[in-house]
Amino acid sequence: MPLVCLADFKAHAQKQLSKTSWDFIEGEADDGITYSENIAAFKRIRLRPRYLRDMSKVDTRTTIQGQEISAPICISPTAFHSIAWPDGEKSTARAAQEANICYVISSYASYSLEDIVAAAPEGFRWFQLYMKSDWDFNKQMVQRAEALGFKALVITIDTPVLGNRRRDKRNQLNLEANILLKDLRALKEEKPTQSVPVSFPKASFCWNDLSLLQSITRLPIILKGILTKEDAELAMKHNVQGIVVSNHGGRQLDEVSASIDALREVVAAVKGKIEVYMDGGVRTGTDVLKALALGARCIFLGRPILWGLACKGEDGVKEVLDILTAELHRCMTLSGCQSVAEISPDLIQFSRL
């Protein structure tokens, strides 16, 4: 039976993976309230289509940070893709390159940045970085990303400590130990004779540290994890180039706002001065359309990419991207939007249910 929607890929992926691997991918923090709300919140939004327009040509292309992508559907940073498929991030990168969309590669990828870039040398990529206490480490990672042609840095800000992920605890999966081991291996590759202290993301990283980061790179800096107007305003004050509205897929602090709900607050705060993106809960083309109508420049996919990877490797990731893009194209056509630029808040209303 063909897999025709993202829900099909989810169901099939679960059958392909061990319970521990599946729980790591799907795991949520605490009671999973935010995890569920990310999806449910989209369903409280209704569409207001316009008809009797010439819809013979519909274009899903847009730009992020000045670079064109085929659709406003990109790939979020998620760790350890080899859990889902042996080639891991290399397969993901090849699929993203073929689709002509942005792939944000995680600090905790299964393969080195060099190996991933070699697998898809023409791909459009950003690098996600967890800031560490060791600034030599931070600078080294930034320099590697610059040398490899990454176009932006994505700084995840919502992880001063890991969320309480009960599934991983029940499975006795020590994620923090795995992350520390990954750091140590990466540093030993660069400095094999030097003993380097390794730490989990720096809990004390704060707004004032952004200036130090900006002093060591010319790449645009995108902050991932903002959920409030106050932090959005501070982000602009500190001259970042973009924001990803995100609650880490409901894996960090439970009972925070769904990403699509927080998006409205953040977009209103930035007033179009910097680009705003979002991730969390996107499962259909209508979800993408709603996020764009509320002001997102593009959406990023996390778990669905891993579902595709678990099902069919590179081909599965490409199918997930193709399905969502086709759904968006159809939804735009049925809503009267010839281009992404025509998608506006007038397209939506909020259900009273």
UniProtKB/Swiss-Prot annotation:
It catalyses: a (2S)-2-hydroxycarboxylate + O2 = a 2-oxocarboxylate + H2O2; 2-hydroxyoctanoate + O2 = 2-oxooctanoate + H2O2; 2-hydroxyhexadecanoate + O2 = 2-oxohexadecanoate + H2O2; 2-hydroxyhexanoate + O2 = 2-oxohexanoate + H2O2. Is inhibited in vitro by CCPST (4-carboxy-5-(4-chlorophenyl)sulfanyl-1,2,3-thiadiazole). Its EC number is 1.1.3.15. The active site is at 248 (proton acceptor). One of its GO terms (biological process) is mandelate metabolic process. A 2-oxocarboxylate binds at residues 130, 165, 251. Its cofactor is FMN. FMN binds at residues 77-79, 106, 128, 156, 224, 279-283, 302-303. Residues 2-353 form the FMN hydroxy acid dehydrogenase domain. The keyword Lipid biosynthesis does not apply. The modification Phosphoserine is found at residue 133. Binds 1 FMN per subunit. One of its GO terms (cellular component) is peroxisome. Expressed in kidney. Gene3D superfamilies: Aldolase class I. Keywords: Fatty acid metabolism, Flavoprotein, FMN, Lipid metabolism, Oxidoreductase, Peroxisome, Phosphoprotein. InterPro entries: Aldolase_TIM, Alpha-hydoxy_acid_DH_FMN, FMN-dep_DH, FMN_HAD, FMN_hydac_DH_AS. Belongs to the FMN-dependent alpha-hydroxy acid dehydrogenase family. Homotetramer. Could also form homooctamer. This is 2-Hydroxyacid oxidase 2. It comes from Rattus norvegicus (Rat). The gene is Hao2.
